[in-house]
């Protein structure tokens, strides 16, 4: 099943999900969530997920400004696991506003607060962001250009989080600065994970600006390719 969190309305301009069982959550009126997530919004989204979604689904989170919703989904995991993230950024920069959850700090928050989370693997992050990350020497955190560079035993399941800003601008334009990974490479990476690990859940964000119809169409096609990888194993 596909669960779409429609914060900006961008999914109303896309078709990739219409061939699959799906739930489209109308979150456009929700305050306190874009970029940063306050406690009220976090509580609302957690209840929405518990009532209408489940962990073992494909979760579409809208633009990268809402990537911290991944952190809310991680609250549902109740067994040891590893987190694999595809992102041009580390998302491990602590918020300038104290403990408030943000799209740039959600992985750091997960690292510090989730006992079941054993290792964090970030694929495709820009080297300048890795150098600025205070976790870049931590043995629980691995930065790499490909999952093939990572020695990760398959004894633990994984949760996968994909921000499409990891994809090259030659493919489409997201709402954040982007990496250099071709879509074809990302697909190969995700298929490798699918074929070698138990997947607990997957989320995808990185939608373009809602007024950018050309890139919304390109993103729609990419979403369909990514969803097709997991649609037979996640429900």
Walk through the language-model features, giving the residues of each.
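Short, conserved acidic/polar surface loops in the N-terminal third of protein domains
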Residues: 70-74, 93-99
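Long, hydrophobic, well-ordered secondary-structure blocks that form the structural core
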Residues: 83-95, 106
